[in-house]
């Protein structure tokens, strides 16, 4: 590999570090007016958003009692509840406000310890990190209609909600309107809400349906640039909309609006999400908003308002919406998208720019996992398959390297012949390559090939919940987390965690697998002819060390992939070079290195 190709190799490697490793450091229409009415009646503080004079502030939402901090248990006990129990979730529904505000996940725990607490997703208002969803109706501007509010207590026809037994809630406003709400849940994470309003009064009533998901307090995020956490949604036929919490806070009036037919919107964390989903054929006005309660607690909301409907005396109107609250399982989201027709619901997972590679990579890993029962083994097999697919390119690359080695004496002669004329050296070198049919850049093809695979596998390991707490062998119990061992505490002999040190802790996550990766990369470098340029030689010598420190804090599944890929690359290169009759540099370079150590 000549100077030019080595420069390209170096540039690609350092670009990989910059892009991946350092990412750690990082007058409205009627429906609009109906939304404003809903905003004022559902938890929005006065004075920060336009108000509808026809809809009074819901004082019950911000009483001094509610402003007092509560434990989650105290907040749950503050309202009558209806039990929720499915194969995937457990919790309760608040009959006060008919809110879905208590959901925990049966199949997921906080740590790899099977006795650790279940993941708590939704919590009631007043609890720390309140997070809930609700749906209902709001009156049109100028309409003095008593619709259910957050302090309305509904009656239920049963005491538990299960996949086999939907529940129907009822509220009579005493003014001729009777509200019915049927709530059903499937065996995963989807709630279906069917609202109806009977108008038994003597005059028509105009209402609009809405649904929202809200969370109080700024959520804890992992703060990786390669992963989106915050507001997310697909409205109409547009692409996915993603906004961080602080981005919406900085918007004019603290909100951003969208319009279209169907879609979904809500909040996404790394592995969990809560979204509201309208009828996919209905036009909606959607909004992301950020605000604060009178006590200073930040509140974030994703909501939509449907078309305004006029209900004649004796008539009934209906509205349907859904709430997704659970784990972002790939097969579950795909099934909802296909079976329920939810637009682009798979994009609730942040697949990234390399979607066209990341999704196939996940499918391949999942298929191999179904055969082996171990995602770590699936990663090893997937690497072999990728190597096999690109073997023709790798073969061409290594043969080109062999040819370059063969003409190395001629290149050295050109440097001696034109020691002061760099331009002439370059011209004669390129002419030599042309005569010998050598492509100096082709030697970098193996590196170029593995970069998109690296990104795709990194995304799969980092964002898909299927990789969370997936074990390998030995001490690796979670492929999505860094190697738990650490060189700097002598692999657990010293009672401290070097990764918790400020500023430098992230770069001290040097476990067994990162060390193996560094060694394998060093060996791979030594499999190539050493560069003539002293500076390049130093850079390539230190590159394995840089990668070891940088990738040490990455998911160990990615480090295992990189290590295995290096081993396969060295084996592949050795085989191809021997078949081409070219001497393999690896053993001579390693021997030369140790001779220098002994001599010094």
Swiss-Prot record:
Q: Where is the composition biased (Polar residues)?
A: 37-60
Concerning Gene3D superfamilies, the annotation shows: 2.70.98.90
Chaperone in keyword set? yes
Q: Does the keyword Cell membrane apply?
A: yes
Q: Which GO terms describe its biological process?
A: protein insertion into membrane; protein transport
UniProt-annotated location(s): Cell inner membrane
Q: Which Gene Ontology CC terms are recorded?
A: plasma membrane
Where do the segments described as Disordered lie? 36-60
Name the source's superkingdom.
Bacteria
PANTHER family assigned to the protein according to its UniProt record, in alphabetical order: CYTOCHROME C OXIDASE ASSEMBLY PROTEIN COX18, MITOCHONDRIAL (PTHR12428:SF65), OXA1 (PTHR12428)
What HAMAP family does the record tag this protein with?
YidC_type1
Q: Supply the name of the protein.
A: Membrane protein insertase YidC
What is the originating organism of this protein? Methylocella silvestris (strain DSM 15510 / CIP 108128 / LMG 27833 / NCIMB 13906 / BL2)
């Amino acid at each position: 590999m000549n100077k030019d190709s080595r420069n390209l190799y170096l540039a690609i490697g350092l670009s990989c570090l910059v892009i991946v490793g350092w990412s750690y450091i990082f007058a409205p229409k009627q429906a609009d007016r109906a939304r404003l009415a809903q905003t004022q009646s559902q938890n929005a503080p006065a004075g920060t958003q336009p108000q509808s004079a026809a809809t009074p502030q819901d004082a019950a939402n911000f009483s001094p009692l509610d402003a007092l901090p509560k434990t989650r248990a105290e907040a749950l006990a503050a309202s009558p509840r209806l039990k929720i129990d499915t194969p995937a979730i457990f919790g309760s529904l608040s009959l006060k406000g008919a809110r879905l505000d208590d959901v925990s996940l049966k199949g997921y725990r906080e740590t790899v310890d099977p006795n650790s607490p279940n993941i708590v997703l939704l919590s009631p208002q007043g609890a720390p990190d309140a997070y809930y969803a609700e749906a209902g109706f709001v009156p049109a501007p100028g309409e003095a209609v008593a619709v259910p509010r957050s302090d309305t207590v509904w009656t239920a026809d049963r005491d538990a909600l299960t996949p086999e037994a939907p529940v129907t809630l009822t509220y009579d406003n005493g003014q001729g309107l009777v509200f019915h709400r049927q709530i059903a849940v499937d065996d995963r994470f989807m709630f279906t809400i069917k609202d109806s309003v009977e108008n038994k009064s003597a005059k028509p009533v105009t209402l609009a349906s809405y649904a929202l998901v809200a969370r109080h307090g700024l959520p804890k995020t992992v703060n990786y640039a390669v992963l989106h956490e915050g507001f997310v949604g697909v409205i109409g036929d547009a692409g996915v909309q993603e906004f961080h919490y602080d981005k919406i806070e900085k918007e004019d009036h603290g909100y951003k609006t969208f319009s279209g037919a169907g879609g979904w919107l809500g909040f996404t964390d790394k592995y969990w999400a809560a979204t509201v989903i309208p009828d996919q054929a209905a036009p909606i006005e959607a909004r992301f908003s950020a605000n604060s309660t009178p006590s200073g607690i930040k509140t974030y909301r994703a909501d939509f308002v449907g078309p305004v409907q006029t209900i004649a005396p004796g008539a009934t109107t209906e509205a349907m919406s859904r709430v997704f609250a659970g784990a972002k399982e790939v097969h579950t989201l795909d099934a909802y998208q296909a079976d329920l027709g939810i637009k682009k619901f798979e994009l609730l997972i942040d697949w990234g720019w390399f979607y066209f590679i990341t999704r196939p990579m996940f499918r391949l890993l999942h298929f191999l996992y179904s055969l082996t029962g171990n995602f770590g083994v699936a990663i090893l097999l997937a690497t072999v398959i990728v190597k096999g697919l690109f073997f023709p390119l790798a073969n061409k690359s290594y043969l080109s390297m062999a040819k370059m080695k063969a003409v190395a004496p001629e290149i050295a002669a050109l440097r001696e012949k034109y020691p002061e004329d760099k331009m002439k050296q370059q011209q004669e070198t390129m002419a030599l390559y042309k005569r010998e049919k050598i492509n100096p850049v082709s030697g970098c093809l193996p590196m170029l090939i593995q970069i998109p695979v690296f990104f795709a596998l990194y995304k799969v390991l980092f964002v898909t919940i299927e990789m969370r707490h997936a074990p390998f062998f030995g001490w690796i119990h979670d492929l999505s987390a860094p190697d738990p061992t650490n060189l700097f505490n002598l692999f657990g002999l010293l009672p401290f965690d070097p990764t918790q040190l400020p500023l430098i802790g992230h770069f001290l996550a040097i476990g067994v697998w990162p060390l193996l990766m560094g060694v394998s990369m060093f060996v791979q470098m030594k499999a190539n002819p050493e560069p003539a340029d002293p500076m390049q030689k130093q850079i390539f010598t230190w590159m394995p060390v840089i990668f070891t420190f940088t990738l040490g804090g990455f998911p160990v599944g990615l480090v295992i992939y990189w290590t295995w890929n290096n081993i396969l690359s060295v084996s592949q290169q050795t085989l191809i070079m021997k078949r081409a009759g070219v001497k393999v540099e690896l053993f001579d370079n390693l021997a030369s290195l140790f001779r220098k150590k002994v001599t010094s």
